[in-house]
Amino acid sequence: MTVPNSNIKIIERDEWLKPYENTIRRRHDNAIRSLYSLTLKNQIPLSDFANGYKYYGLHIEQAESEDAGLNTSSGHTAFGRHWVFREWAPNATAIYLVGDFNGWQETEQFRLTRIGNTGDWEIRMPIDAMSHGQHYKMNVYWRNGQGERIPAWANRVVQDEDTGLFSAQVWNPTDKYVWKNSSFHPNRSPLLIYECHIGMGQDAERVGTYNEFRENVLPRIVAAGYNCIQLMAIQEHPYYGSFGYHVSSFFAPSSRFGTPEELKRLIDEAHTMGIAVIMDIVHSHAVKNENEGLALLAGDESQYFCQGERRRHPAWDSLCFDYGKKEVVHFLLSNCKYWLEEFHFDGFRFDGVTSMLYYSHGLGESFVSYDDYFNGRQDEDAISYLTLANLLAHQVKSDAITIAEEVSGMPGLAASFEDGGMGFDYRMSMNIPDYWIKIIKEQPDEKWKPSSIFWELCNRRKDELTVSYCESHDQALVGDKTIIFRLVDSDMYWHFRIGDQNDTVNRGIALHKMIRLATLSTINGAYLNFMGNEFGHPEWIDFPRENNNWSYKYARRQWSLVDADDLCYKWLGVFDRDMIRLVKGTNDFVGTAILEIWHDDNQQMLAFMRGNLLFVFNFSPTVSYADYGLLVPEGSYNVMLNTDSIEYGGNGLADDSVTHFTNFDQLYAKQHKGWLKLYIPARSAVVLKLEDK
């Protein structure tokens, strides 16, 4: 099928893409052809194709006629409610369900039947054949082999505390969760994301729960001003220390945090509080475990995954999906719809998109020219899948949020499908944290150049929205350092009590605030913070593992630090809250252009405006400027935020209660501009508001 698509706007908006027009059009056509095929030549919506989770797995069905009745092992037909279980396993020769209900023994009553030549297997069972809470697996046979497997579509998987083994669990609670808020719509003006991990969301050295997070952490996020949480590690994963990125059961919310109903309540109450909930979804790879995952479900290594060298991810020790298979696309698209519909997630942050886009997974690639995006080394099946996933998400929820974690800079990633892009709403600005780390590590403070900082913060494609951030969970992992730890290091342990700060701590506190303000104030779409980093949470993240004696000491958040009135963490937490409030309280902040007013690299000064807000930064570690003149729109200006305020751990050197008026200059009178004279202390930033006349 060929579909005319003459209006590829991403090419019109970027003349450097013109030489690659044929490739861009081919990729767009591939997605259109896939959509046409999956929707039966546009006879059904894509969301209907993605209903696999309603068909496969374990369900209760209602038989309403003799033809739809249950054929029991005795040959009689039963009516009414009954269990049905289905699995796609084309390579299998026999499948049995084994579990608590049959003593984990293979019996004819629980033997599946192949459905024609589809590769599907099915069994129908009386409603009393199994009950809520019972454990089960599949015994799968194939030519010259056999294995005990967890169903691919299982929606509840638990780990035995004694043996450590995982099994599926019959999940049919008497009290179904009743949603209280079904009409929630995310606030994107702007989108302020709080990246979270349920298990490490508490002070105690253990795994936290959905309920604890809902009761204790959600109120903190509301108070801090964020309007979206990004939940990590929701899909079931065998190894806690993988941070949730080695997924085994894609449809099962991790049971180590609680029940599905408890997760639903968390999301429901977040919505009631005005907080959107997006999921860190992993479709870039899967765990290689055979017993827990999809690796060798029915003896065929290529059932879900690529063949040969492309099967195993060389850096992640995991398996790579074959996005060219219709059944794999069905599985993954159904997974997207499942989380949106069944759990009311508001969207996804797609992990590892770079790994999906390139046959090399982006490893060893430099991405220095446009050739690197269109040289034939891209997985166009993956590009098609990601495009379909975005179309589906926005079809299921028109205001769904989709974010791509992508480091190469692939053009069109966050451009709309109609314009020739892949359809993500946002892409992660992964250059920003790398830049902050680089200058902190490699440049003394007096060498920081505001022009370079400003350029890096605004370095993005003009037609694509981004998520700006100083640091995420990646920068906090063991082996790396958070920004505050790079700035202060071990002095956090000895001089972070208020009144006992040394020069290193004072420097770190000042720069921590300036870095966060500079990053947030230059966003064009969204902003992200990993939980605890807003108040300078100490140390790294290190999940329990053999090398640390399975300790939870560094797999938690010490909220008590920011709650303590005698510690410097309080200053950083209050500053972050007020900074977020300022941006949230500004009408159409992200829709307002960034206008550079002035920079001087020798003086280390930077000033820019967004609407009626003036942002002024003095990165000099030693020089304060009195009566520093900035040519700005004439009028009166009031201080809205000052990193040097005493309440934020600053020195309070300026009187922020003073209204500042511009000085008349005949030379700029026709432009309605005047000179604003300000006192800007060293290593500080101030935000002023131009008042209405």
Predicted regions and their residues:
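C-terminal beta-strand-rich structural cap/linker in extracellular carbohydrate-active enzymes
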Residues: 132-133, 657-693
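Substrate-binding/active-site clefts of carbohydrate-active enzymes
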Residues: 158, 176-188, 193, 197-378, ...
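Conserved, mostly hydrophobic/aromatic
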Residues: 87, 196, 221, 231, ...
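C-terminal accessory region downstream of the catalytic core in glycan-modifying enzymes
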Residues: 579, 629-664
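The feature marks proteins involved in alpha-glucan
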Residues: 2-71, 79-84, 113-195, 200, ...
